Amino acid sequence: MNNLKDKNIIVTGASGGIGNSIVKRLNESGANILASGTKIEKLEDLKSKFNNVKILKFDISQVDNIEKFIEDATNELGGNLDCIINNAGITQDNLAIRMSIEEWKKVIDINLTSTFLMSKFAIKKMLKNKSGKIINITSIV
């Protein structure tokens, strides 16, 4: 992962689980990281441990604010974006037969719509560099 030195990377879902581990590994590689999530205490813990980590609290279910988030996150990273790791997501404990339409829409908005919009607005930033990477992660941990 040496080729990530000084690369500007956004990681969503960084306040727990896989996202937290991704931030730690990227920091070891020398990347500049913008970690986002909903649990500010966990984000602040990451920031206090690593020099290359900046944080922004953001709830990706707020799809109308995603474009502004990408703008703010890119500005925090100095204006350039090399990669976004779309790691944030949710699951419901209900079986499909018991899931309400509201629960279904929330899962779709967070896991699909927000990932699409994060990627869409990140691409606009990456086009300035004429390169970039988008990594989408889905899992149930």
Task: Please annotate each region the language model reported.
Residues 58-69, 101:
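The beta1-alpha1 cofactor-binding region of Rossmann-like NAD(H)/NADP(H)-dependent oxidoreductases
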Residues 95-96, 103-108:
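Substrate-binding pocket helix/loop in short-chain dehydrogenase/reductase
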Residues 29-44:
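Conserved glycine-rich Rossmann-like NAD(P)H-binding loop of the short-chain dehydrogenase/reductase
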Residues 119-120:
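A short, exposed helix-loop element centered on a Lys and neighboring polar residues
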Residues 15-16:
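Conserved glycine-rich cofactor-binding loop
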Residues 87-92:
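Conserved NAD(P)H cofactor-binding loop of Rossmann-fold oxidoreductase domains
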Residues 139:
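Residue(s) in the substrate-gating loop at a strand-loop-helix junction
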